[in-house]
Amino acid sequence: MPVKKYKPTSPGRRNMSVSTFEEITKKEPERSLLEPLRKKAGRNNYGRITVRHRGGGHKRHYRRIDFKRDKIGVPAKVAAIEYDPNRSARIALLHYVDGEKRYILAPLGLNVGDTVMSGPDADIRVGNALPLRQIPLGTQVHNVELEKGRGGVMVRSAGAAAQLMAKEGNYATLRMPSGEVRRVFIECMATIGQVGNLDHQNIRLGKAGRKRWLGRRPEVRGAAMNPRDHPHGGGEGRAPRGMPTPKTKWGKPARGVKTRHNPRTDPFIIRRRTR
């Protein structure tokens, strides 16, 4: 997916880049796989903001993606590669031989006309989904399950891939895109290959308005707030923060603090992430 740059005809265009979308083969989505998507604007069921800087954005439909890949042993043909506004990856429309249609994440190298299949007897080929037990060591995988039958929850964004490093007993060892090395139950499903749309990380939005189209509202610096609103706030003019380390809006350390609190799954992590 090459990235297109513009001539600097305006301040917003000067640093803007967009995808060429040349891998997209179908503009209109499959209507039978669409669902309404209601905007939350970062609010929970009480109406309180739980995620800041969210709201607005272009109206979207949700594309129902098959993360489980549970249609075992039934081949499907790739009918189209489509754009999905709800994720960084592209999606592939599959037509199964029994007439069913499903969307999956489009891996790098999957083209219209290719045949994919899921199950323990599937070939080791891009787009096929197999249990980790059946996948050779060193293979790149994505859309990895953490619990058998629950569907893939890891390694799903554009350009992501995990590497299968070892298999021992009931667990397989994976090196994640973050550098974390963790164990996963060996019967969990994973899809062969790397998620496509690799150049997503090279796109520059160029202007604040384009961020608003994505549903992101402005982030205000703590130093620009009043002292009642942020520990860094207040002072006459530009004032130092007045503390040795930066704090969050709620007074907690903002740098170098572990944010993971799930001791139940700690034994499955062999090495912490490096970035």
From Swiss-Prot:
Amino acid composition bias (Basic residues), ranges on this chain: 249-262
Record bears the keyword Mitochondrion: no
Intrachain disulfide bonds: none
Region (Disordered): 220-275
Keyword annotations from UniProtKB, A to Z: Ribonucleoprotein, Ribosomal protein, RNA-binding, rRNA-binding
Compositional bias ranges of the Basic and acidic residues kind: 227-239
GO molecular function, one term: structural constituent of ribosome
One Pfam family from the record: Ribosomal_L2_C
Lineage: superkingdom: Bacteria
SUPFAM superfamilies from the UniProt entry: Nucleic acid-binding proteins (SSF50249), Translation proteins SH3-like domain (SSF50104)
GO BP of this protein: cytoplasmic translation
RNA-binding recorded as keyword: yes
GO cellular component: large ribosomal subunit
Subunit structure: Part of the 50S ribosomal subunit. Forms a bridge to the 30S subunit in the 70S ribosome.
PANTHER family named in the record: LARGE RIBOSOMAL SUBUNIT PROTEIN UL2M, RIBOSOMAL PROTEIN L2
Physiological role: One of the primary rRNA binding proteins. Required for association of the 30S and 50S subunits to form the 70S ribosome, for tRNA binding and peptide bond formation. It has been suggested to have peptidyltransferase activity; this is somewhat controversial. Makes several contacts with the 16S rRNA in the 70S ribosome.
UniProt family annotation: Belongs to the universal ribosomal protein uL2 family.
Protein name per its UniProtKB record: Large ribosomal subunit protein uL2
Species in which this protein is naturally found: Roseiflexus sp. (strain RS-1)
Gene name per UniProt: rplB
